[in-house]
Amino acid sequence: MALKLFDSLTRNLRELQPSHPDGVFRFYNCGPTVYAPAHIGNFRTFVVNDILRRMLELEFGAPKVKHVRNLTDVDDKTIKRARDEGRPLADVTRQWTDKFHADCAALNCLPPHIEPTATGHIREQVDMIDCLMQKGNAYRAADGSVYFKVSSFSDYGRLSRVKERELQIGSALAGKSQAVDADEKEDGSDFALWKAHKPDDGENSWDSPWGRGRPGWHIECSAMSKKHLGETIDLHTGGVDLLFPHHENEIAQSECCNGVQFSRHWYHSEHLLVDGKKMSKSLGNLYTLDDLKQKGFSPMAVRYALLSGHPRKQLNFTLDSLHAAEKALATLRAYRATLAAGGAAHHVFAPVIAALEDDLNTPAALGALFTIVNRGKGEADVESFDRVMFALGLKLDAPTAPKAEVPAEVTALAEKRWAAKQAKDFATADALRKEIAAAGWSMLDRKDGYSLEPAKK
């Protein structure tokens, strides 16, 4: 059975195949904006992409897959974080890039073959913007910013079906006039390709034919995918939140500049809910991987829980699902210990692989796996089982001892101490540290905050 994946563009299940003469499958997925730790909603998308990468390698062979994932290291959020902390932009983005890599490794996500940064590809972005200017798809505003003219691309909206939703995409398409905004865009739906330098940007600007500034968000993916994968790629993926406007804008930029189809296949994973609600800081349900580790859960349990729902359906993430995941992993470890060496029993686990080949149906794959496990070892062998574990990205090493959960009262003391330290009230901060120590905890300060660990006895 061939690997088939739902295509967000055609709304059909389609077989994945490389299109270039060298037989290499070219795969791009949007990476993080590195200004803060990624949360588990972000990691659902990255884990899904990791499963896809693994299945592509099983299908075509590892040397025949080329995976690119970008890092957005300059935008409004990264610049604001650097300004607020009084640090160079590169220091801030390096810190959060390192953290992202560490979390990906803990979740057993394969690193991309190439991980380009926006700041490392300014020339490529300027060149693509210049191409769009030359072809009449972009224009320079009075302040030096450059905008893409949405009305110049007749196919705009075909990915997201914006026209079907009667979304205003410009006076030329919608037949209605729209007010010109403060940035002097010709139409309200036009989007920035190049942002003219403003005082809040600090030193984070570059020279261009239109004056100093920085690239817009959308152009980076078009420029970097072109450089590293070519003008037409086989697959572009991301979370459903990126479908519009980001991916729609990528198509417009790339196809207007290059004159060929940008991506042959599009795939989007759905949102993650926590306890049935959308994640938000105000609800206290915006978990990072570290948050869950501090509650005593292993990264593999987090990965397993993220696989428990179909990637194209919303997944309700709960702490109960993590407890269930830990038990499931223990069962898989015990099962593997009963298996003998060998490698001829791939047919035993064929239903698991078949489920993954059918639109990455991870819950069906896990169900098929436990049907096999519950029957006993039978003909199964270690190598065949490990092949399935590779496909799912599950490492069955013995988990480390779980960390103790921090009591709410200790967390409250830590928050007060951190606030006192930020206010330079060091006497209060020292007194609160002693209270925390008396409760059996150590508070460790970091540049970006603090951590709590049980005090050493």
Curated annotation (Swiss-Prot):
<dbReference type="InterPro" id="IPR024909">
    <property type="entry name" value="Cys-tRNA/MSH_ligase"/>
</dbReference>
<dbReference type="GO" id="GO:0005524">
    <property type="term" value="F:ATP binding"/>
</dbReference>
<dbReference type="InterPro" id="IPR015273">
    <property type="entry name" value="Cys-tRNA-synt_Ia_DALR"/>
</dbReference>
<feature type="binding site">
    <location>
        <position position="281"/>
    </location>
    <ligand>
        <name>ATP</name>
    </ligand>
</feature>
<keyword id="KW-0479">Metal-binding</keyword>
<feature type="short sequence motif" description="'HIGH' region">
    <location>
        <begin position="32"/>
        <end position="42"/>
    </location>
</feature>
<dbReference type="InterPro" id="IPR014729">
    <property type="entry name" value="Rossmann-like_a/b/a_fold"/>
</dbReference>
<keyword id="KW-0030">Aminoacyl-tRNA synthetase</keyword>
<comment type="similarity">
    <text>Belongs to the class-I aminoacyl-tRNA synthetase family.</text>
</comment>
<keyword id="KW-0067">ATP-binding</keyword>
<keyword id="KW-0963">Cytoplasm</keyword>
<keyword id="KW-0436">Ligase</keyword>
<dbReference type="InterPro" id="IPR009080">
    <property type="entry name" value="tRNAsynth_Ia_anticodon-bd"/>
</dbReference>
<dbReference type="GO" id="GO:0004817">
    <property type="term" value="F:cysteine-tRNA ligase activity"/>
</dbReference>
<dbReference type="Pfam" id="PF01406">
    <property type="entry name" value="tRNA-synt_1e"/>
</dbReference>
<feature type="binding site">
    <location>
        <position position="250"/>
    </location>
    <ligand>
        <name>Zn(2+)</name>
    </ligand>
</feature>
<feature type="binding site">
    <location>
        <position position="246"/>
    </location>
    <ligand>
        <name>Zn(2+)</name>
    </ligand>
</feature>
<dbReference type="InterPro" id="IPR032678">
    <property type="entry name" value="tRNA-synt_1_cat_dom"/>
</dbReference>
<dbReference type="GO" id="GO:0008270">
    <property type="term" value="F:zinc ion binding"/>
</dbReference>
<dbReference type="GO" id="GO:0006423">
    <property type="term" value="P:cysteinyl-tRNA aminoacylation"/>
</dbReference>
<keyword id="KW-0862">Zinc</keyword>
<dbReference type="InterPro" id="IPR015803">
    <property type="entry name" value="Cys-tRNA-ligase"/>
</dbReference>
<feature type="binding site">
    <location>
        <position position="221"/>
    </location>
    <ligand>
        <name>Zn(2+)</name>
    </ligand>
</feature>
<dbReference type="GO" id="GO:0005829">
    <property type="term" value="C:cytosol"/>
</dbReference>
<protein>
    <recommendedName>
        <fullName>Cysteine--tRNA ligase</fullName>
        <ecNumber>6.1.1.16</ecNumber>
    </recommendedName>
</protein>
<feature type="short sequence motif" description="'KMSKS' region">
    <location>
        <begin position="278"/>
        <end position="282"/>
    </location>
</feature>
<feature type="binding site">
    <location>
        <position position="30"/>
    </location>
    <ligand>
        <name>Zn(2+)</name>
    </ligand>
</feature>
<keyword id="KW-0648">Protein biosynthesis</keyword>
<comment type="subunit">
    <text>Monomer.</text>
</comment>
<keyword id="KW-0547">Nucleotide-binding</keyword>
<dbReference type="Pfam" id="PF09190">
    <property type="entry name" value="DALR_2"/>
</dbReference>
